Amino acid sequence: MVDKEIIKRDEIDILNDACFKSLFRSVEARGMISRFLSAVTGINKERFLNAEYIGGELIKGKLSERGKIADIIIKLDEEDETCIVEMNKYDTGDIIEKNLSYAYSVFNEKTRRGIRKWPKVILINIDNFNRFNADEPIIELEMRDKNNKYNVDLVKVYHIVLDNFDNLNYNIDKEIAKFVEFIKTSKFSELKKISRGDNDYMAGYRKVEDLSTDPEFIGYYDYEQAHQDDIEMAEYTGLKKGIEQGIEQGIEQNKKEMIINMVNEGLELDIISKITKLSIDEIKKISNN
């Protein structure tokens, strides 16, 4: 077994894809998540507390989730509403359009199955960038006529622009502001201060703390952090189109370095194999070079 003290750390990036999904889908953090979603959408918090969060927590051995089309899909009660939540760490050029296609895919799937009433789909984008060059911390989009008199609310889209929550010109809902502060904070000492005195947030804090000492999760977290940053930043800067081969070589080198670091930190070879999809023999070969 791997000694938890070996991998214990003082901070963690909650915006990391693996961490965000695990936190958002967890039963432990359901209270703080429901309060946030309710404040954004105006939907009663109890409905989010009792909703079905498709995919559940990340399953050991199946962490890559290659078949998933969205970060979190929440099936609300008999009202036949679905809420999709997407963490967008980088603007890769088409990320917003791609997420919108997810929302319409869910809508189309529901209409094909035969319906008693038209379904509603809510898409919440948590953006770590400002695609619209907006000042507002929260942007709400829906289908309206050009005179802004009539609207169709079957598909509604929200953008939570993280960078704009420091803008004091807007009266930001306290529940949304607190959640944004939490997910933007990486140091455990600060996360604990934010959560202190709030049972829902303390439960969320403890979940993140538990994740940070899970050997398999943290190995995947580190690998995903390095791998995704390389890929997404390459797309973001436009390098991918011009020098794909060089990027692939860089990612491959980064992958090798991550494997060597995992071995040096004492992570078990079978766990590294699950994370990287490489055989134990391949891992040994890389770590011995």
Question: Where in the sequence are the language-model features?
Answer:
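Short, charged alpha-helical interaction segments and adjacent helix-coil junctions
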Residues: V2-E11, D77, T82-N88, A177-N289
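Accessory alpha/beta interaction modules
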Residues: M1-K156, D166, T237, K241
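Upstream accessory/linker segments immediately N-terminal to the RecA-like ATPase cores of bacterial MutS
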Residues: L154-N169, E175-K178, F182-K193
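Generic recognition of short, well-ordered alpha-helical interface segments
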Residues: L15, E28-M32, D94, N171-K174, ...
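Short helix-to-loop capping/linker segments positioned immediately adjacent to catalytic or ligand/cofactor-binding
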Residues: K110-G114, D166-L168, E190-S195, Q249
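Short intrinsically disordered coil segments
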Residues: Y102, P137-R144, D173-V180, Y223-Q225
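Generic structural signal for hydrophobic core residues of well-folded globular domains
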Residues: L23, V27, V40, D127, ...
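Short, solvent-exposed coil/turn linker segments
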Residues: N44, G55, D145, V161-N164, ...
